[in-house]
Design a protein with these regions (language model features):
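Beta1/beta-strand and adjacent pyrophosphate-binding region of the FAD-binding site
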Residues: 3-18, 36
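Conserved Rossmann-like nucleotide-cofactor binding loop
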Residues: 18, 22, 43, 173
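Glycine-rich FAD pyrophosphate-binding loop
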Residues: 27-48
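N-terminal FAD cofactor-binding segment of flavoenzymes
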Residues: 45-89
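Short beta-strand to alpha-helix junction loop
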Residues: 101-122, 260-263
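Predominantly flavin-linked oxidoreductase catalytic cores and closely associated redox partners
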Residues: 123-280
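FAD/FMN-dependent oxidoreductases across multiple families
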Residues: 234-236, 242, 258-375
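C-terminal helical "tail/cap" subdomain of flavin- and related membrane-associated enzymes
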Residues: 343-515
Length: 520
């Protein structure tokens, strides 16, 4: 076998979004850098991470400059919506709904990741990056800046790449973190997922549904079908995301402590079986058919990486850790890490000092804070519409007052600063983590009392819209706080129901006891 040698400034393992974005930012910062991208696949396949947030949309449009591409080749996202029911027999138009009254006031997109990744990689190559594809990294040696070595197999031939810096953008494969023992599971958040793409999904905004459920259709002027719709239940939630061309992504995420998905022979069939037990899913997915071969399952979704940068290497995107798909934070982390690592590597290649210890400390604090604030034990209350209404208002308002306001204030530089950086960020983290703990405590009381999900029908919370303007988001934040404090007061009178174990309510909130509580 002939061995070919290549020397470069930066070698990036993985050419999907995080790797390609990092490469593109490096070339924009210093066009003279020799950047090599190593991608194992011949063509990208579809992956999750299809829904953007206001933060990742800012990165896509104002940092990468993809506004025109996204407008022509992807879908505009119209916020998120959550649907709840007291039982599977609930009427479709009586399910509790949380969402927007109007279309989104800030940019957001529903993206086919295969085509988005392909486009960003093409931009990186056009900017002067060298692409080696398909090629598999079979071995690496991290010798510090200037002396790290990658061994590849490309087309049956062996190649060696000597790089000043290596960037791991290999996603969940997390090549460096796994090899070095830096990857850790997070048993405190045992969430798993099943997902697939479907055809034949009903149009949320169709004339047929409008005629069948006129009051439901008239309740909002927003386009429900372009939102990320969530079916919510105790210990689980389902995303329903439309994609360009008509396919629809549907995924089930669940906490294995609280919920067990249906058994079955196929992932898509199991997802449909579960969704059709929810009144909304039964209507919207009545004629849905799974796209063969386009279905996946992951256990232990959540993991952390204890060191994400060292002398001569760094991790970006999912190679640096992953928390949870709820609220679509994946591309946010990709955006912050791509910009931060590109800044650090460009500085190092220019002979500037990079504070690696500080970077690892700030990233670890951001990652842990994001988990504690938003996700720790959230699946205990995700199936209760009243609790989630307060959580949604506070979560999204603080998100807009914090990260969204941060990046829109100066997109060119603020993606280099992690959320929760600084004194104000730390204070905000303590507050958000506190109210999350209190909502969990309220949910546990309701579970024990048999009243969990009692208000999951016959009302809706329709929000005028979120922006990063303090007045608007502040008003919604205080609305969420009022709801939270009122639930705290009501929970003082809740008493555990001795005849029914708490687990029964969590596993099946639609039993007779819960239904009786819901009708009082």
């Amino acid at each position: 076998m002939r061995v070919m040698h290549l020397t470069c400034d930066v070698a990036i393992i993985g050419g999907a979004f995080s790797g390609a974005a990092t490469a593109l930012l490096l070339k924009r910062r210093n066009p003279a850098l020799h950047v090599v991208i190593i991608e194992k696949s011949e063509a990208f396949d579809r992956k999750v991470g299809e829904s953007t947030t206001e933060v990742s949309s800012c990165f896509l449009t104002r940092v990468l400059g993809l506004t025109n591409y996204l407008g022509h080749h992807q879908l505009a996202k119209q916020g998120l919506r959550m649907w709840f029911a007291r039982s599977e027999d609930e009427k479709f138009d009586e399910c509790a709904e949380l969402g927007a009254r109007f279309n989104s006031r800030m940019p957001g997109f529903q993206v086919d990741r295969a085509t988005l990744d392909k486009h960003v990689l093409a931009l990186a190559v056009a900017a002067g990056c060298e692409l080696i594809r398909p090629a598999k990294v079979v071995k690496f040696e991290l010798g510090g800046a200037g002396s790290s070595l990658l061994e590849l197999i490309e087309g049956g031939e062996s190649r060696q790449v000597l790089a000043r810096w290596i960037v791991d953008a290999s996603g969940r494969a997390a090549i460096i973190a796994r090899k070095r023992g830096y990857m850790q599971a997070m048993p405190e958040h045992p969430v798993n997922s099943l997902w697939a793409r479907f055809t034949g999904v009903a149009d949320w905004d169709s004339i047929a549904l409008r005629e069948k459920f006129p009051k439901w259709a008239a309740a909002t002027v927003a386009a429900r079908g372009w939102a990320t719709n969530h079916l919510c239940g105790p210990g689980w939630w389902v995303w329903i995301i439309p994609l360009k061309g008509g396919d629809v992504s549907v995924g089930l995420v669940y906490d294995e402590r609280l919920f067990t998905p249906p058994e079955g022979t196929g992932i898509g069939a199991r997802i449909l079986a579960h969704c059709r037990e929810h009144p909304i899913g039964r209507e919207i997915l009545a004629d849905a058919k799974v796209i063969e071969g386009d279905e996946r399952a992951f256990s232990q979704l959540t993991y952390r990486v204890t060191q994400v940068m060292c002398d001569g290497w760094a991790c970006v995107g999912d190679a640096a850790g992953f928390i949870d798909p709820l609220y679509s934070p994946g591309l946010d982390f990709c955006s912050f890490t791509a910009q931060s690592v590109a800044n650090a590597v460009a500085d190092a290649c220019a002979g500037k000092c990079v504070d690696i210890r500080d970077y690892n400390r700030r990233f670890a604090f951001c990652f842990q804070s994001w988990f504690d604030c938003i996700y720790r034990d959230k699946y205990f209350y995700i199936g209760d519409a009243e609790i989630m209404a307060a959580a949604l208002l506070m979560d999204v308002a603080t998100y807009h007052l914090g990260p969204v306001k941060q990046v829109y204030s100066d997109p060119a530089t603020m993606f280099g600063a992690f959320p929760f950086d600084g004194f104000a960020g730390r204070v905000a983290a303590k507050f958000i983590a506190f109210y999350n703990r209190r909502l969990v405590a309220i949910a546990r009381k309701r579970i024990a009392a048999g009243t969990y999900g009692a208000r999951n029908a016959k009302w809706r919370l329709l929000i005028p819209g979120f922006t990063h303007e303090p007045k608007q988001s502040g008003r919604l934040l205080f609305s969420g706080i009022r709801r939270w404090l009122w639930m705290e007061i009501k929970s003082l009178w809740l008493r555990k129901k001795p005849s029914q174990p708490a687990e029964a309510v969590v596993k099946n909130p639609a039993d007779a006891e819960t239904e009786r509580a819901a009708t009082k």
